[in-house]
Every structure is written in C-alpha cells, then in structure tokens.
Amino acid sequence: MSLLCVRVKRAKFQGSPDKFNTYVTLKVQNVKSTTVAVRGDQPSWEQDFMFEISRLDLGLSVEVWNKGLIWDTMVGTVWIALKTIRQSDEEGPGEWSTLEAETLMKDDEICGTKNPTPHKILLDTRFELPFDIPEEEARYWTYKLEQINALADDNEYSSQEESQRKPLPTAAAQCCHWTYLGWGEHQTFEDPDSAVDDRDSDYRSETSNSAPPPYHTTTQPNASVHQFPVPVRLPQQLFLQGSSHDSCNDSMQSYDLDYPERRALSPTSSSRYGSSCNVSQGSSLLSELDQYHEQDDDGRERDSIHSSHSYGSLSKDGQAGLGEQEKALEVTCESEKEKTGESKEMRDDATIHPPSDLVLHKDHVLGPQESLPEETASSPFTQARAHWFRAVTKVRLQLQEISDDGDPSLPQWLPEGPAGGLYGIDSMPDLRRKKPLPLVSDLSLVQSRKAGITSAMATRTSLKDEELKSHVYKKTLQALIYPISCTTPHNFEVWSATTPTYCYECEGLLWGLARQGMRCSECGVKCHEKCQDLLNADCLQRAAEKSSKHGAEDRTQNIIMAMKDRMKIRERNKPEIFEVIRDVFTVSKVAHVQQMKTVKQSVLDGTSKWSAKITITVVCAQGLQAKDKTGSSDPYVTVQVGKTKKRTKTIFGNLNPVWEEKFHFECHNSSDRIKVRVWDEDDDIKSRVKQRLKRESDDFLGQTIIEVRTLSGEMDVWYNLEKRTDKSAVSGAIRLQISVEIKGEEKVAPYHVQYTCLHENLFHYLTDIQGSGGVWIPEARGDDAWKVYFDETAQEIVDEFAMRYGIESIYQAMTHFACLSSKYMCPGVPAVMSTLLANINAYYAHTTASTNVSASDRFAASNFGKERFVKLLDQLHNSLRIDLSTYRNNFPAGSPERLQDLKSTVDLLTSITFFRMKVQELQSPPRASQVVKDCVKACLNSTYEYIFNNCHDLYSHQYQLQEQPLEEPGPSIRNLDFWPKLITLIVSIIEEDKNSYTPVLSQFPQELNVGKVSAEVMWHLFAQDMKYALEEHEKDRLCKSADYMNLHFKVKWLHNEYVRDLPALQGQVPEYPAWFEQFVLQWLDENEDVSLEFLRGALERDKKDGFQQTSEHALFSCSVVDVFTQLNQSFEIIRKLECPDPNILAHYMRRFAKTIGKVLMQYADILSKNFPAYCTKERLPCILMNNMQQLRVQLEKMFEAMGGKELDSEAADSLKELQVKLNTVLDELSMVFGNSFQVRIDECVRQMADILGQVRGTGNASPNARASVAQDADSVLRPLMDFLDGNLTLFATVCEKTVLKRVLKELWRVVMNTMERVIVLPPLTDQTGTQLILTAAKELSQLSKLKDHMVREETRNLTPKQCAVLDLALDTIKQYFHAGGNGLKKTFLEKSPDLQSLRYALSLYTQTTDTLIKTFVRSQTAQGAGVDDPVGEVSIQVDLFTHPGTGEHKVTVKVVAANDLKWQTAGMFRPFVEVTMVGPHQSDKKRKFTTKSKSNNWTPKYNETFHFLLGNEEGPEAYELQICVKDYCFAREDRVIGLAVMPLRDVAAKGSCACWCPLGRKIHMDETGMTILRILSQRSNDEVAREFVKLKSESRSTEEGS
C-alpha cells in the first residue's frame, strides 16, 4: 500500500475572468475528492489530498469543472499514470499540465486524454517515501540539533530561521490535554475520521437539505481515508481527551455558519479551524522532531516511526501501540490561562497552533546510557535534551513579549503558557516505568472526535475578518457610549390642541375638544396617550435635532453639553465596558482613545449630519388574518419612512401574498422609523362610509415598526406583524429586503452579521483567552434567565448593541447557542444549551391564539437562517451521539459535575428532537430515547471489548496489590482464571451503570434503564465468548471439573443477579446451563466415585468403633450420617446451581439419582453380607437394621429435596425403585434376625408342648373348667414368655419403631410356625409319625420302634381341653405382641396367615376322619396336575352309575393298559396297577383293587375291570380315584413307579370317561392338605386315617443303580 500525495496549486484559463468559477476533482481507484470552487481565470486552490494506492498500473484522473446555475461544465481533464509519479517526502514546485477535452478508454478504464485546450493546471504529485530516513536527511537533522544547542548556549534565536518554519495545520492544535493509552492493536484505526464512521456510520445529519460539512460524513466502498482535503495530523487515534475541562477544547472552536461562501479561502487566509487546512510547504517542526528521533547512524532497528504524515503508530511487527512493556502514557500540557498572545492569532489567518506537547514512541526516546552518534555530539543525549528545552522555552517567552507589543511580523506557532513548549525530547517521564491502567469505573475508551462539528459547523469567520471587526468595534462603542437604555425619556404632559393635530406615532388625528393627547415638554413631540410607549427615541437627541433645524443654537448647545456630560459619566462609571471592548477587538490604547473621541462626536452630531438612502423590497407575507366573509383577505402594504408613504398593489383573496415590489426612500434622520403596515382592501358600502369619516377605511392586518438606526447594509429579514392596539386581531409575518447606504458607511455588513461578529468575538475572548477554554455559566434566575449569556459587563455590551440596532432576542439566543456548540463538552454548557434550545423551541413552536403561522413557517422566516441552524443542530446531534457512545469516558461516574452534564446532554438531545418534530415538522425524527439507548449500547460494546482485551491488567490494578505475571493474559484452555476476573469487571461496569448512570439518564423511565441495558449488552457479549470458550474446553478438558463448577456458579450468580429479571429475557430459558452441562455431568461422575470411596471409609470407621449410636436419642450409627452428609453436600452443589433449564436439570437429577442408588445399595450389600455374623449380639443387629431404616428415611427426605412430585419422572422412578430395594433388604435383615431366634424358640415351644401334654381333663364349659384352662394356659406359656420378655424389652429400647415392628412380625411368625410345627402339626418328615410307619413296614426290624411310637402318638394327639388351653394361650400371645398398641396391630395379628394356619389346624383336630378326608378331596384339586416329567401313563375307563331309588353310586373302573413306564431294575420287572377309592364313609367297603402283574413288560396290557360301591351320604364330588403303578417284589414292599389322581367330579357330569393318566412321582398338595395329613397322621388307631396318610405320602421309589 502506497500513499499518494497530490497538491492542487493553481490554474491558468483563457477567457473572461467573470465566466470562471472552477473546482477540481481527483479520481483514482474509485475514490473521488473535490476542491472548493474559486472564481477567476487564474484560480489558486493550494489544497492537499492523500490517497492509499494498492494498484500502480492505474492512473490519476484530474478534472476541472466550471460551476453553472443548473449544471456544471468540464473545462478539461488530465490523466497521470501512477508509474510516472516521483517518490519524495517533500513537496515540489509542481508541474504545469495542459487540460485536454476528451478521455481515452480501454476495458472500461481511462488510459489517456486527447484534444488539448488552451487551459493549464499546476499540480504537485508524489508518493511518500518509506519510513526509513536516508542518511543525508539524518545528517541534516543532526546539524539542526547542533544549531539549536548552540542557540541555547548563546541565549538567542534567529527570527529569520523561525519565520521559515511553517505552522502545523491540524485540527488537533486546539487540544490542550492528550492522553495516550497503550491499548495494543484493538483500538487502532487508520484514520480518526474514518474510524468513527466505521464505528457508527449513521451518526450523521438526518436532514437531507442541509449543506454537507467539509469533512466527509458518509462512507463509500473503497473510499479514501481522506475524502476531502486532509491536514497533516498527529496520530490522534492514539490519543484520549483528558479532564472534562480540557477536553472541551477538542470540540468545536469556530464557525463557518454565517455565509458559506466565506469558507473557500485562499491559502493565506484559510480559516484556522477549517476542514480544508492546507498542508504546509515542507515539514513542520513536529515532523522535524519526530524524524530526529527516527534517525540513528549506528544501524539500530527502527521499530517504529512516528511521522507527521503517518496515520498511526505502527511497531515493527505490525501491531499498533507503544510496545509490550508500556501500558499507559499520559502527556499533559499546561492550561491556556496565560495565552497573552491570542490577539495575534486573530490577525494571522494562516496561523495554526500545533499541540503544546508531543506523544513520542518509546523507542524514539534514548535512554540515559545512550548517546548521540560520535560525529554529531559527544555529550550525553539527556544534556542535549535539556539544552533544547531551555532554548525553546526562552524563545517562546521572547515571542510572547513581542506578541504583546502587537508586532505581527513573527509567526505565532509556539503555544502560550509557561513550560507549554515542545518538551517532548527531554522532559518526558521515564517510559520504562509502567503506569497503572485506569480503573474500570473510569474507563477511557479510544475515540476520534469527528471533525465535522469542530470545523465545518464551527468555523467562526468573524474572528478573522479584520475589516468587519473594525467596523463592529466602532458600532459597539457607539451603542455603549450613549446606550438606548440610558437615553433621556420623554417628559409627557396632557395637552390640548387648538388646531387639528396628528399623532407623531400612528399619524391618527388627536380627537376631542380638549386634552386630546400627550406632548413632551422637552422635545415637543405629540401623540395619543396610547402611543406614548411606542416612542422610544431619545428625548435629548430629538431636541438637539429639532433645535439645530430651527436655529435655536443656544438651546442646542445646552442639550449637546448635557449629552456630553451623559457620555462622560457613562465612560467614568463604566470603564470596564470599554476596556472589554478594546480587549475583545485587540485595539491598542492609543487607537482606542482616538476612536472614543470619534464615536462621541458622531453621537453628538446625532441626525443633523446623518443621511441615508433606503431601498425596501416588500417580498411577501405569510399567515395573515382573514378579514373577509369568504375566509380570506385582500392584502396590500403601505411603507412609510418619515413623512414619505408608498403602497403596494393589492393581492386578492390570499393569506400568503407575494408582492415583490421595490421602493426607494431618502432619510435624513436616524431617529426616523420605517412603518410597514398591512391592510385588507375593502370596496363595499361600509368601507366607503368609513372612508368619509376616517383616514383608514380598510381593515388593519398588522404592522412592524423598524428603527432606521437599526438598519445597515443589505438585509433580508422576516418581521412578525404586531398589533397597533389591544383590539387588533393580527397574525403572520412579512418578509422585507432592505438595502441601506448610510453616508460614510456605504460598504458594511448588515447589523445581524455585525451582531454575530460581536457575539462571537466576545465569546471567544471570554472563553478561550480569558477563561482558558472554560465557559462562564450564568447564575441568573427567573423567566428571562436564558437571555443572560455573559457576565454583567459583556451582557450589557451585547444587549445594548442588540437594542440599538434592532437585533431580535431570538437571534441573540440562536447566536449564543451556535457559540456554545463549539464548547458543548465543557462543564455546565450542556445544561445552558438545553435551556437555550428549549426556549428557542418555545418561541417558534408555541404559537399564540392571535397568530396562525405554522412553526415551520415562522422558523423559515428566522433571520439566523433556516439552513444554517438546521445544519448546526444536525452536526451537534451527530457529535452528541458520538460522545454519548463513549459516555463512560466523557462523563466519568466519579465526577458529579460531569454526570450532571450527561443528564443535560440528554436533555439537549431531547430538545433537538422536539425542534425537529415541532419546529421543522419532520414526520418521524429519531426518538431521543432510542438515540440514547443506541449510544449506550455502542459504549457498552466498546467497554466490553476493552475489559476483555485488558482483563488481567485491569483486575490486577483494581483488586490486587501485586500483579501476578501470566503466561497467557487472555482466555486459555489450560486454566479458567480469566473468566472470574472478567465477570468481576463486568459486574463493576453494570453496578456503575446501575448506581451512577441510571439515576442520571432517567428522562425516559419507560424506555431506557441504563443499568438494565448494560446488563443485557454485557451478558449478550459475555455469553458469546463464554459459550465459544467452553466449546473449546470441552474438546480437551484440561482443567479440573471443580474449576468448571466454580465458574458455573459465578456465571449463574451473574445471570441471577443482573440478567434474570431483564424484560427482554423474561420468559426465556437461559442458555448458560447448556454450556456447562457436560462439565457438570463429568463432575457428577467423579463425585460418584468419591461418594463410594467415602462410603467404604465411613463403614470401616463405624465398624472399628463398634457401630456406636451417634447419640442417646439417635438409634443409628455414624456411617449413615456420614454417607448422607456427603450425598447432601453433593446435592446441595447441584441445587445451588439453580438450573433454570428443566431438561438439563432432569439430566442432573437422573445422574445424581444413579449415584444415590449405587451408594445406598453398596451400603446395603456390605451390611447384608456381614449381618448374620452380628446376629449373636444383642444390640448390634438392631442398630444395623436401624441404619437401614435411616437410609430409607434419609432417602425420602432427599427425594423431597430433589423436587418430590415435581422431580423428573425417570429420576423419581429410580429413587422409588431404590426405596423398594432398601425395604426388601430391611425385610431380609429382619427375617435373618428373626430366624436367629429359631433354636431358642424351638426349645421354649418344646417345653410348652411337654407342659401341654400333661394337661388332663375334658373340655366342658363349666366355670371351674374355664379357670382350670386359664391356669393351664399360663403354665404352658411360661417358658415362651420368659424368653420373649427379656428380648422384646431390649428391642423396644434399641430399635427404631419401624424396625421394632418388623422384628416383632418376624418373632410372631417364628413363634406361630414353631408352635404349629412342634405342638399342633409335627412334620411328616420327622422321625415320628407316618415316615416311621412307612419305614417300619418296610423293615421288620423296626417293628419294635413302631410299637413304641404308636404309644407316644397317643400322647401327641391333642385332646379338646388341650386345644382349648392352646387356643387361650394364642390369645395371650396375641395380646402380648400387641402390647397395648405399642406393638403390632390387632388387625395384622388377626389376619396373620401363620395364626390362621395354626387355628385352622386346631379346628381340624376336632373333626372326624371322614370329614377331614372329604375336605381333603374337595380342597386338593391339583394333586396329579402339572406333571412336568411323567414316568409313564395308564389308560383307564371310568363309568359312574347312580341308583335312581336309593341314590347309591356305583363306579366301574377298567384298567386297560400302561405305557412308557420309566423304570430301571437289575432283576425281574413285574408292573401292576393299584386302584384305590378315596373318600368318606369307606370304612366298611372295599377301597382298593390291584391288577395282575406283567413280567418284564414296560407297556403292559391289563384290561381288568373293578367295581366300587359308594353310599348315598355324599355325592361323587367327595370322592377320587388314586391310580398307582408298582413293581411287584416278593418278600418285600412293592416299589412305587408312579402315581395319578382322578377326581370323580370330573366324571359325574358325563357319567363315563376314558383317558390316559400321566404318572407323577408324588402327590401334590397345599398347606391345607398337609395340615389334614398331619392331623390324620396322629390318629394311629384309625385304620382309615392310617391308610389315607400312607396313600397320600407315597412317592416314587429309588431306582436300582441310580
């Protein structure tokens, strides 16, 4: 990228000078720049342009255009190939080029020109050289330094050499306080103007018809950084304004608002602050200094160049800034309190002050150990610096003294004030010492002031127009030496006219016979009583005029002496006024004294020697009153000067008439008035009658009275029409163009322009010279306080000038508003401007009932100029938006004064919006609230970017005493240290906005809350960065999960504290939980392992301590507490995350529920595994079961804490399932514990059985028998009760209530089952009973045992009394376990299956054998069903016949065959089938038949038929057939192969049945069957019972060889 510099110098045209008004356009690379227009055939522009060139194969196209009324015409064009342009750092004399008429095109690009014209243009084109300085130039600057050092020693400085130095034309010259912050690459813009445009491209005028400012305010594709002539400037994008007092000097300094044509000045008269500042011919002193630093002969690296032509400060590696070690550099100049040479500046138009201090790159400053090159100087460089500084200071002071003497010969580039000079070389602090960054609460954001409002709007041409200033100076003295406010009032007396007399004011007849009007006794003027207040001419002056005309010389002389005395008194009493006027206009004392004499004489001469020619053009009127019945009027105008009266033509039926009529008057009396009256012409009968009676027959529409003395030059003025009397109905305004040629003042500006000159110069003097840049803030109070602009003296000056020369108060206000616009950033100024604009708005917008002129029309009639004021407001609005976009910098929270200015600035914005809406009547101007909101957001965006990029340094400075060095100051995937710091800084920003700025910016409570906007913007930006960072972290996860959790908490706190309640985010599910979800799940995974490890440790500690109770009230041990303490702590972390996303929270709860399940089941498994070993101890098993119960209790609590019914269904189901599992484990532990008492309870029940067996007697119901039964029951229960008493008392003390009930239930079960098993129903498998019978039958040797058993069986069979005792004992045991409500519930005990089984068995004891057999047959319906592994099958046919008479039943059974018999034997296999009829009432009938045996046949055929006779007592459903296949054996019991059962109820319905019956290994029966079998087994004397027990107890015999 190359930098092309083009200087458009001048041109020579062939032709008449009058026909040329030319400007030049430059085009290169789609970028276009334009000069100002200059008249004449030899125009001189002398303007510089700079372009960034990326393609050298193109050319520069130069076009010269002549401005026309409708369109512009081309004079000629020049095309210069870029390859032909020289490279140089210095301007040359330029080259004359001939303009040609046509361009040559190739591939849509210009490649040349043709057809030469006689016109020529002088251009200087060059490419800037690279930053490295040639050795020749380095030697040149070294020589310069030696000269300066020599000058310092000789204490003199050559004025000739000084005069050769050109001023630095830079807008930065106004700035008196710059601050540089080393912000690195983040805030470095290529150009201050374009930077601001890029940042906020819509901060520009919303009014399309306003003239564009000289500086560009719009961006284009590929636009040059300099769309308009750009001065050489310091890299001010690296600067920051300092204090608010100083920063205001960076604002608008001057105006170009009065007349646009004054902007296009020649190089020698260019506005000091104009945008088209000319680049000086050669390098400025700043450039010299910078280049001096850059040169070095020993070849050290030139890391950075700080040239006056560079846009920024670029380091060697391409990054902007001061280097890595420097963080901040502030260079502050002296204030301008002692600018004594300012008057010199007023006279030297081309003089532009450079900044009084330099910001130098660190690398440019040689350290104390470094020295100059040997051939240059042998002394240390620091000494040279000291010489330099002393020399410059002395020269500057000398120049100030010369300037005070008024010698204009020397340039005034050196700034005023002590030590304000170029002390950048040696007086700079040591840059290696790091200065702290500003606090977050006072963040200074880099911004470049847009030049538009500083130059284009604020160029005060009146400060430079010496001719105008000289004239205004005289007029001001004239107005102040004999002010209107001090004029002698008329001495009116009631007067009677003897002849017809007319009013001097209204020219109406003084009606009446006597006392018709008023007459002044001094000057003799006569008028109506109502008109006396309208006469404001000075009585003394009028008397002098009248006397001189009538020859009363003595009287005239007396009056003149009186006026002289009045002026002397005025001069003596108010010397400060005239001193201020002299200082403002920088007039020497001698000239001032002479001028005072001249002015006094002109006042004394009065109007006697005064003469003027007045030309009045009545242009038009607006908003007139409707006087006719048609709702309109027929207006015409009369104009009267002195006694001469003229009228316009009549415009019929128009309330906005246009006349355009010109009248000429001669006036010889400066006290005369121009009376302009508007009339409605009437031609009806009423009008004709009035014409006979009155001089005024037409309707009065309004008037304006203009003092002739207020006229000057050429004026185009709107005047509001005034009433003549209170009864007048008047509205509207009239436009007059007045040209006045006063004798001796033929070529002067209008008084409005003169007033502007006075006001601006006064403002400049009081503010910039006397106030050192500060603006005086009036302290006036009251309705007219806004009309006070200066202190008492200056205010009197402008008021008297305005009063004498007819300047409207609204014009004064708008002029002062324009002046203040250049200082709008000074303390207190926004409030004054806001009040001023509010009153300007009120003046134009608040129409009265007497006028129907719209606000827009009234404003258009403003003498200030509609376009001018609109442009001023547009550019002010633009600058206010830019400043509000950096409100944290411009209005620090730590300054209450600046905060008040911030509030006033917003009020000013609101007033501008009101102006646009009500006065300009724009349809939809930008709402002030939205503008401020956008500005706040823009500032917050910049603030966030700054704190993000400087987070570590800011945090270290604000919150830590010592900075900790970081490997990576920004975000890192290796740690998370950056983010908490950033959150802290964000909070400080939000708090500052909330506490400091929200109360200030409170004008829009419904639309703008700065604290909330701050939180919203900060959160939005933070969320983007945080989300991206965590996505990167998720890939590697180099940090601990706890670190992520801690960050999650901080983010959550930030959101809940500041973001959650924001209106814009309400109702939305926050995103931040999703960023952390994977990290939280990772933490939960790790936490599960920690919890399991902790569980094992807790159990080990508990076991080591012997599972001691945690306290006397707590019945569980420490391990439960420890486990749930750890789980609760983990859950508390999850709960405190307060996850607002229900889906993510559900994921957390599911995962944590799994952790709870694993931990608790692990606990239960360990406890269950070791529990049997602890059952031998008394208390320990109870405590362990209590632990399990406490797990369940705590789990329920945790379930509720996790949400209860609101918990995620999957997590809730998981916890419910876990609760069931724990309940099952507790049941198992209770069962194990209950079973551990089995042996002891067995012993107790056996003792009970022995005692019960000794009970004798019958079971009758006599009282004695009942008492005996109760007593026996007590005796029987004593062994059991002794055991239970001791244990249950212990259990009640040690066990939790729930655990106690479970233990009681298990003991109850064990006791009931044991009593049933031991006392009531001994098991068949015991060595007693049936098994012994079967065994004895098989082995003859056991026959004696069988006999002994049978004897014992008689004793085991319970008698009715024993049953009664046992039944009563059961009731007692039941009451014992109920324990008066403290134990098991009665309903549970009653419905207990164990008790019911026992009682059922007891009830069966009293039933007969037939009844028991019948019950067995009916209840046991599945004895042979469900044979999974049949051992064969038998085919049988059954026929059932019932006798119709007797009801007896006959059953015929035919055994057909057997099939697939599974049997192994070593000997002979001889199977046969045994068929037995089972049922009641069979004792006297044949119950069993057998077939013949078949040898060695596994599928034998029998075909044998048997007949069973059944009684009629029972139906067939009470009987069943039992088929048994056996292997016949001689001399021993037959072996059982298989069994089958066929109930006759299945046959009864059909009457017959034929089927294959599968053979099972044994008979299946339920508890009822077993109980009946046990009871019948004890009836050893009953053959049927014995046979039934044997039959049902048979099972398949053991096979041989198996």
Swiss-Prot record:
A zinc finger (Phorbol-ester/DAG-type) spans 489-539. Its main location: cytoplasm. Residues 1-97, 595-719, 1430-1557 form the C2 domain. GO terms for molecular function: calcium ion binding; diacylglycerol binding; non-kinase phorbol ester receptor activity; phospholipid binding; zinc ion binding. Residues 189-223, 263-282, 292-355 are annotated as: Disordered. It is found in: Cytoplasm; Membrane; Golgi apparatus; Synapse. Residues 206-223, 266-282 have a biased composition (Polar residues). Ca(2+) 1 binds at residues 628, 634, 680, 682. Residues 1210-1231 form a coiled coil. One of its GO terms (cellular component) is neuromuscular junction. InterPro entries: C1-like_sf, C2_dom, C2_domain_sf, MUN_dom, Munc13_1, Munc13_dom-2, PE/DAG-bd, Unc-13. The modification Phosphoserine is found at residues 16, 307, 379. Keywords: Calcium, Coiled coil, Cytoplasm, Exocytosis, Golgi apparatus, Membrane, Metal-binding, Phosphoprotein, Repeat, Synapse, Zinc, Zinc-finger. Gene3D superfamilies: 1.10.357.50, 1.20.58.1100, 3.30.60.20, C2 domain. Belongs to the unc-13 family. The C2 domains are not involved in calcium-dependent phospholipid binding. Interacts with RIMS1. This is Protein unc-13 homolog B. It comes from Mus musculus. The gene is Unc13b.
